[in-house]
């Protein structure tokens, strides 16, 4: 996979818990997740080596912001793990 020059949307105006579809990143390269629209919710960046078993790989966001990882695993996804209110969008660049 080659690095993206523009972010792609993983979560688009979601109003419930749930994970996005995974993207295949450049393993070992940096990745950036930007989340907006959080009023009362938690969004985690999750990674996987096999595309099946996912784990949260950095601090989950409870307010709008950006998380950065220096060495991405092969697969990445955004997961809204707690939802109370907000209209959440998550975009990734890797």
Where in this protein do the model-derived segments appear?
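Transition segment at domain starts
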Residues: 1-26
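Conserved Ser/Thr-centered positions that define the repeating blades of beta-propeller domains
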Residues: 46-48
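Edge beta-strands of jelly-roll/beta-sandwich modules across compartments, strongly enriched
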Residues: 2, 83-94
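Aromatic, loop-rich ligand-recognition surfaces of beta-strand-rich domains
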Residues: 19-35, 93
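Acidic glycine-/aspartate-rich tracts in secreted/extracellular proteins
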Residues: 38-41, 50-52, 82-85
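Tryptophan-centered short beta-strand motifs
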Residues: 7, 50-60
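Noncatalytic modules at the cell exterior or secretory-pathway interfaces
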Residues: 29-33, 70-87
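Exposed aromatic-hydrophobic patches
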Residues: 21-24, 64-70
């Amino acid at each position: 996979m080659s690095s993206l020059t523009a972010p792609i949307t993983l979560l688009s105006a979601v109003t419930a818990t749930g994970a996005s579809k995974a993207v295949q990143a450049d393993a070992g390269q940096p990745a950036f997740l930007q989340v907006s629209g959080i009023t009362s919710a938690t969004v985690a960046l999750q990674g996987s080596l096999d595309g099946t078993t996912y784990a949260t790989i950095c601090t989950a966001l409870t307010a709008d912001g950006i998380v950065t990882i220096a060495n991405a695993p092969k697969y990445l996804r955004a997961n809204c793990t707690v939802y109370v209110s907000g209209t959440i969008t998550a975009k990734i660049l890797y």
